[in-house]
Design a protein with these regions (language model features):
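Intervening/peripheral non-core polypeptide segments
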Residues: 1-2, 20, 206
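Bacterial N-terminal signal peptides that target proteins for export
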Residues: 1-11
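Bacterial N-terminal signal peptides
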Residues: 10-20
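Glycoside hydrolase catalytic-domain context in secreted enzymes
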Residues: 25-616
Length: 616
C-alpha cells in the first residue's frame, strides 16, 4: 500500500513537472505577441489583435455570457464568471483576458453572495454635495482598488443622469441637477477609478431621468435642450475621465431606443465627442441586431439575444459589414489596453477594511449638509448637554442605504432584490461615544407619544428619519414615508431643541421645518455614516457641504407635478426577451433648458432650500 502511494505521488509529480515547460512556453509566446509591446498605443495594439481574431472570437467579444439569476435562465459558461453583473470571454490563445464586470455605484456590489467584503461609500448624490474633485477622486480610487481585490476589471458605476425628476428612484446614484457640477465630479471619479487599472464607465446615456416606464418610454426633447443639459454632463465627464465604456439607457429618445439611437451613439458620442471607447447596453436594453450595430452599439449585455448567433449570421450574409464588427471589437480591446487590464490583470487580495472605513467616514463628513441651525444649537456642547434622546426607526442599529443594482451588501447574508438594507453604523452608539457624560436614551418612534415623552425630559432630541429609494421604482411624493413627518411634529412640540437628521436619496419636503432647531442632510452615508454624523453634531468636523439639487416646497412647484407613468394597459416590462420597434408612450421635457434651479429662477418659484445652499 505504501509502495502504491509512493508511486502515485511520484507519477503525479512527474506529470506536473512535464506540464510546466509547456505552460511556461505558452506564457512566453504570449509575451512575444506584437500587441504585447507596451510602447505601442492602445489603438495600435487593438488593431493588431483584431487582425488575428476569428469571426467566432469577434462575436464572443461583443456580448455577455450571462448573469446569475438573469431571466431565470442558465448559461453554459457561468463557471467562468466572477460572480458579478456579467462577463465577456477571454481569448486565451491571443493572451486577452476576460472582462469581469461588477456594479459599483457607491461600492462593489454582490460581495456577500461571493463570500467577500466591500466598503459602502456615501451615495453619489452625497459625493456631489461635497463639491470636491479630490474627494471624487478618492471615491473612485477606493472602488477601483476593491474591484481589483475581488477579481473584477470593469465597473458599472459612474451614473450622471441629471436631476430633472427628483422623485426618480435612482437620484441617489447620480450627481445632482447641474450638468457642470455633475460632469466634473463624475469625471474625476472615473479618472481615479481607472487609475487603479479597471475599465471605468459612465451611464445611463441618455435622458434616463425617471424609473417609471423606463423600458417603454420615449423622451421627446429638442437637440439644443438635450446638448446643453443632460448630454453636457456626459460630455464633461467623458472629457475629464476618459472612461473606457459608456452604457446606453433603456428608454427611447426622440423615437429611437437609446441603444439603437444613431444620433446619440454615432453622431454625438463617437463622431462629435471623438469617444474612443465602447458602448455597452444596459442589461437587457438591446432591441435589435442590424439597427443597433449600425447605430453604434458595441456590446450587448448580459447575454447574446441579438449580438450572438444573429449577429454572426448578419455578418456572414453581408447585412452587417465586417468592418463594422471589427470597429465594435477594436473599441473593446482598445479600452482593455488603455486601462492596463491586459498587461496587469487583477489578482484577488484582502481588502483593507479599516482603510475603507476611514475613507468612507471622511467622504461622509464632507458630504453632510447643515440646512438649519437656530440659536446655534450645533455644535452640541458635550460638557453642558446632560441628556439626549435618540429617536428613529433603527437609529440604534444602523443607517439606510439605496437599493437596486447599486446596493452594496452589508456584512452577513446577501439581501434580496429591493430589500431595505441598513448598514450596521449605529447613530445611538456614535452619539454615546461622543457624549460619555450624558444620559443617552433611545426610542424607535413607533409610538410618537412615547417618543415625545422621552424628548420632553431630555436636553436635546435628535430624530433620525429616512427615505428609501431604489432602481426600478419612483417615489410617489417627496414626503417622508411611514408618518415620520408627524413623528417630528410631535417630538418638536414636546422639545423645540430638536435636531432632525435626514437619511434620504433625494430632496424631501419639511412641513415641520419651523418647529425644529436643527436639520442635517446626511443622504445615504455609507459604512461609517453614524460616526460622520456624530462628528458634525459635536463640532469635531465643521460642515462644509452644499446642496447639489434644489429642495422644492412641494411637488406642485416641479416642472411636472406628477410622475409620468405608462398609460393604462401598458406594462413597463423589461424588453430583454423580444425585439420592439416602438416605445409604448412618450413624455415631453417641455421645460427644455430650465432644469433644476434654472426652472425655479425662471418661473419665480420660491424653494425650501436652493441649489448650492449649506451652512457651516
Amino acid at each position: 500500500m505504501k509502495t502504491y502511494s509512493r508511486i502515485s505521488t511520484l507519477l503525479a509529480l512527474f506529470l506536473t513537472l512535464a506540464l510546466v515547460p509547456s505552460a511556461l512556453a505558452q506564457q512566453q509566446n504570449q509575451k512575444n505577441f506584437p500587441w504585447m509591446n507596451t510602447s505601442l498605443s492602445p489603438d495600435e495594439r487593438a488593431d493588431l489583435v483584431v487582425k488575428q481574431m476569428t469571426l467566432d472570437e469577434k462575436i464572443n467579444m461583443v456580448h455577455g455570457q450571462g448573469m446569475l439569476g438573469w431571466a431565470n435562465k442558465t448559461f453554459p459558461n457561468m463557471h467562468l464568471g466572477n460572480g458579478g453583473a456579467g462577463f465577456v470571454l477571454a481569448i486565451e490563445r491571443l493572451g486577452i483576458p476576460s472582462l469581469q464586470i461588477s456594479d459599483a455605484a457607491y461600492g462593489v456590489r454582490s460581495s456577500a453572495q461571493n463570500g467577500r467584503y466591500s466598503t459602502a461609500l456615501p451615495s453619489n448624490l452625497a459625493s456631489a454635495a461635497s463639491w470636491d474633485t479630490e474627494g471624487a477622486c478618492e471615491y473612485g480610487a477606493l472602488i477601483g482598488r476593491e474591484l481589483r481585490a475581488q477579481g473584477f476589471n470593469m465597473t458599472l458605476g459612474g451614473g450622471v443622469n441629471i436631476t430633472r425628476e427628483p422623485r426618480n428612484g435612482r437620484t441617489f446614484e447620480y450627481m445632482g441637477e447641474d450638468p457642470i457640477l455633475a460632469g466634473t465630479l463624475v469625471g474625476h471619479r472615473i479618472k481615479c477609478e481607472q487609475g487603479q487599472k479597471v475599465i471605468g464607465h459612465i451611464k445611463h446615456y441618455a435622458l434616463n431621468d425617471q424609473e417609471s416606464g423606463r423600458n417603454e418610454v420615449n423622451v421627446k426633447i429638442g437637440k439644443r435642450e438635450m446638448r446643453e443639459t443632460d448630454l453636457l454632463a456626459f460630455e464633461i465627464g467623458i472629457t475629464i475621465g476618459n472612461p473606457g465604456a459608456v452604457m446606453c439607457s433603456y428608454n427611447a429618445v426622440n423615437g429611437d431606443f437609446a441603444c439603437e439611437n444613431k444620433y446619440l451613439l454615432n453622431d454625438v458620442l463617437k463622431n462629435n465627442w471623438k469617444f474612443p471607447g465602447f458602448v455597452t447596453s444596459d442589461w437587457g436594453g438591446t432591441h435589435s441586431t442590424e439597427k443597433s450595430s449600425a447605430a453604434g452599439l458595441d456590446m450587448e449585455q448580459p447575454e447574446d439575444l441579438f449580438y450572438g448567433p444573429k449577429l454572426k449570421e448578419a455578418v456572414e450574409a453581408g447585412r452587417v459589414p465586417m468592418a463594422q464588427l471589427d470597429d465594435h471589437v477594436r473599441r473593446v480591446l482598445r479600452s482593455m489596453f488603455a486601462t492596463g487590464i491586459v498587461d496587469d490583470p487583477p489578482q484577488r487580495s484582502m481588502i483593507d477594511v479599516e482603510a475603507g472605513f476611514e475613507t468612507s467616514r471622511k467622504l461622509a463628513e464632507n458630504s453632510i449638509v447643515l440646512l438649519k441651525n437656530s440659536n446655534a444649537i450645533l455644535p452640541l456642547d458635550r460638557n453642558k448637554v446632560r441628556s439626549i434622546a435618540i429617536i428613529g426607526h433603527n437609529a440604534d442599529m444602523g443607517m439606510i442605504s439605496g437599493g437596486g443594482s447599486a446596493q452594496v451588501d452589508p456584512p452577513g447574508p446577501p439581501p434580496k432584490w429591493l430589500q431595505h438594507v441598513w448598514f450596521p453604523t449605529s447613530p445611538l452608539k456614535a452619539v454615546k461615544a461622543k457624549a460619555a457624560n450624558a444620559k443617552v436614551q433611545f426610542d424607535s418612534g413607533s409610538d410618537p407619544a412615547k417618543a415625545a415623552a422621552l424628548a420632553k425630559q431630555s436636553d436635546v432630541a435628535i430624530v433620525f428619519v429616512h427615505q428609501w429609494t431604489s432602481e426600478g421604482e419612483d417615489l410617489p411624493s417627496l414626503s417622508l414615508p411611514d408618518k415620520q413627518d408627524a413623528l417630528i411634529q410631535q417630538v418638536a412640540a414636546a422639545n423645540p431643541r430638536t435636531i432632525v437628521v435626514l437619511e434620504t436619496g433625494t430632496a424631501v419636503t419639511m412641513p415641520w421645518l419651523d418647529k425644529v432647531s436643527g436639520v442635517l442632510e446626511a443622504w445615504y452615508a455609507g459604512s461609517k455614516g453614524a460616526d460622520a454624523v456624530a462628528n458634525i453634531l459635536f463640532g469635531d468636523v465643521n460642515p462644509t457641504a452644499k446642496l447639489p439639487m434644489t429642495f422644492p416646497r412641494s411637488e406642485a412647484d416641479l416642472p411636472h407635478p406628477t410622475v409620468r407613468t405608462p398609460p393604462p394597459g401598458a406594462k413597463d416590462i423589461a424588453l430583454r426577451m423580444k425585439a420592439q420597434d416602438e416605445p409604448t408612450y412618450s413624455i415631453e421635457y417641455d421645460e427644455g433648458l430650465k432644469v433644476g434651479y434654472k426652472w425655479y429662477d425662471a418661473e419665480k418659484k420660491p424653494v425650501l432650500f436652493p441649489f448650492g445652499f449649506g451652512l457651516s
